[in-house]
Amino acid sequence: MGREELVKKLHRICSQYPDILGRVILFGSYSRGEEGEASDIDLYIEPSDLSVTTAKIGSSKRYKEFKYSLYDSFDNEFDLMTYGGKRDLERVKKTPLWEQIVKDGVLVYDQRTEKV
């Protein structure tokens, strides 16, 4: 599956969860077009409510439903980098991971730009 097709499929899934997803960015080998047969899909995820902590996001029922829908729709493994809360968001933006996301990232979903 090519990057464009992957992004469209991911967007369809993400758009079903506007109550929990604020922004989703594809990064890593798929965003660079360097994926191999065993490549996982790397996603950076910000919640729709930026005040919600990372721990609360990960334990929410809706987030678990979102994860299951990803795994049900793809044969690949996922690496979901989910960050919430002001402190965690500020911290991740000072890391090499963030530099990679900025450099290679492909926006999959942004709740603020979705049409209702």
Role assignments for model-derived ranges:
Residues 1-23, 32-37, 47-116:
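Catalytic core of pol beta-like nucleotidyltransferases
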Residues 27-29:
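Glycine-rich beta-strand-to-loop/alpha-helix junction loops that act as flexible
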Residues 42-44:
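Short, well-ordered beta-strand segments
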